[in-house]
Amino acid sequence: MAQGAARCPPRVARKAAGPGGRATFPSVSESDSLQARVDRLELPFNEFGVDPYGISKRHLKQALPVFAALYRYYFRVRCFGIEHIPPRGRAMLVGNHSGGVAVDGAMVLASTMLEMEPPRLAQGMVERFLHKFPVSSLWASRTGQFTGLPEHARRLLEDDRLLMIFPEGAKGTAKLYRQRYSLVDFGTGFIRLALQTRSPIIPFAFLGGGTAIPTVFNAYGLGKLLGVPYVPLTPYVLPLPLPVQLEIHYGEPLVFQGTGDEEDHVIEGYVQKVKARISGLIERGRAERHGRRQGTRLLP
């Protein structure tokens, strides 16, 4: 990312986290502002506040204050380059997984809702196991997060939605603490999807999730008993996120030409270009983070 890229401007002044780093929930005036941001989403809600995909204004208005508290006060997220996300029209946010719990996706969603003008809803593709749990499945779909099926993703883009994709898949969430800034193999489906729908790809780097949830071991056997792929275990056993400052670095859009029917080696070449861009954003973000902590300014 170019030096000096604009930081996402906070729409509401941040407050210090509560005692012990706990999230402080928004005040009444802030809650009113959050409700207004949901109302300003440019989605085709009907008279009951539900869009054609089942996204519910009521559920978004209940969820956004929780996301805002985590984003602004608990994780104190720093966001850079959000001007690279188009305010309207189809686009794909493609980035790295960071941490064994879906903190990354939640905070990316929060950034587009809280920092963009007008606000946009980033819609993600969730793992199928989530639908084994009725409550989480309901809330996921009512807030725009759907099962990661190609037909769902294509329909969303054809309807000019903002799609959030983590091409590392479930393997990306299984990274241990020592692997937190590495990238595992990317799937290729997202490139074919981008070509078929002529969607720009906005790469992003998510930093800090692996420190917030410092996974030292993944308990696959326990996960099987609980109906999930695995349970990440930390030095304090439970995978509860620590109040570590997180960062999101959005890069300039990537546009590839093609139909999506290209040979595998062509698609793989495009995948590697996206992966290299995300890796570059991670390394640049880490260097800038280190520079701020050291009180030094990075050279160009």
Label each residue range with its predicted role.
Residues A2-H59, R154-P300:
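Non-catalytic C-terminal accessory region of glycerolipid acyltransferases
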